[in-house]
């Protein structure tokens, strides 16, 4: 084997061992999200933080108006219960579709670490889409990205929408920021310890937990959507969370019939957006 071939083999093995995604693994998923964004007036931006490069899509209709930011879920973090995915880019761009349906003048979509980014663009350590998906350094860079998006829109405030694990991120951000005027979660993982126990999977060691800061969200207008057919995040997770916020009667919770954790949200989203925050 020539020296060049040996070098190429070594490089390929290194990529496999570090868990980085090759272009062929994420290209189709990237094109799907990009297509939705392009058809609905969104432009692509890469936001470089201290530790991560985060992808965003932004649609600015009226500079100076509030900005609604949709935060992606955990994506394809695991290929099976025992095998970590080499690319956490979502297999289904559900959150991008929800963002595209939002009639607000200024809307942004924000991906999580490792999603929609090629090799070398962002850290390749799979712990940031598994056990440390809500680590302080992750939340810190997403927080900075939210500020960048807000400034891009010239927005006086932001409203956060988070799906699944993105709901956890949105809640954690809302607790640390002073410019958040509303919080919506969709099948949100608002207590990852409880969700891990429910699914009989390993706990997320090194991750911040939204339930621990729920009391800091008292007084913030919010709405938590629970899927009636959710087998991933049980309803008691949101119920326990809002009780800690101070909503003993669960008035900030809406149970959505005919949807599951993964499907059905798109068809109902416009109507769900009309439900006022509590």
Please state what every model-predicted region is.
Residues 18-19:
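C-terminal motif of bacterial Sec signal peptides marking the signal peptidase cleavage site
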Residues 31-61:
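N-terminal cap/lid segment of alpha/beta-hydrolase-fold proteins
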Residues 53, 59-111, 116-118:
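Short, surface-exposed "cap/lid" segments of acyl-processing enzymes
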Residues 123-152:
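Alpha/beta-hydrolase active-site loop
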Residues 161-166, 170:
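Gly/Ala-rich beta-loop-alpha elbow adjacent to hydrolase catalytic centers
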Residues 188-189, 193-250, 254-257:
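The feature captures the conserved acid-bearing segment of alpha/beta-hydrolase catalytic domains
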Residues 259-268:
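Catalytic histidine-centered segment of alpha/beta-hydrolase-like enzymes
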């Amino acid at each position: 084997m020539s020296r060049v071939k040996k070098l190429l083999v070594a490089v390929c093995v290194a990529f496999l061992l570090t868990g980085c995604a090759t272009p062929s693994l994420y290209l189709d998923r990237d094109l799907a999200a990009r297509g939705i964004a392009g058809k609905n007036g969104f432009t692509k931006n890469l936001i470089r933080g201290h530790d991560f490069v985060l992808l965003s899509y932004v649609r600015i209709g009226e500079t100076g108006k509030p900005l609604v930011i949709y935060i992606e879920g955990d994506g394809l973090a695991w290929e099976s219960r025992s095998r970590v995915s080499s690319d956490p880019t979502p297999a289904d761009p559900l959150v991008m579709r929800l963002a595209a349906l939002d009639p607000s003048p200024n809307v942004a979509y924000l991906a999580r670490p490792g999603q929609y980014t090629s090799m070398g663009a962002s850290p390749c350590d799979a712990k940031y889409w598994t056990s440390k998906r809500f680590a302080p350094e992750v939340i810190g860079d997403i927080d900075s990205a939210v500020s960048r998006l807000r400034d891009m829109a010239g927005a006086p405030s932001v409203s956060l929408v988070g799906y699944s694990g993105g709901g956890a991120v949105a809640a954690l951000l809302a607790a640390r920021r002073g410019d958040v005027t509303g919080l919506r979660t969709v099948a949100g993982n608002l207590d990852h310890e409880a969700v891990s126990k429910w699914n009989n999977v390993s706990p997320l060691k090194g991750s911040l937990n939204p339930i621990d800061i729920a009391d800091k969200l008292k007084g913030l207008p919010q709405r938590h959507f629970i899927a009636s057919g959710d087998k991933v995040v049980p309803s008691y997770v949101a119920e326990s969370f809002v009780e800690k916020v101070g909503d003993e009667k669960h008035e900030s919770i809406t149970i959505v019939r005919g949807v599951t954790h993964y499907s059905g949200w798109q068809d109902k989203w416009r109507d769900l957006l009309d439900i006022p925050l509590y």
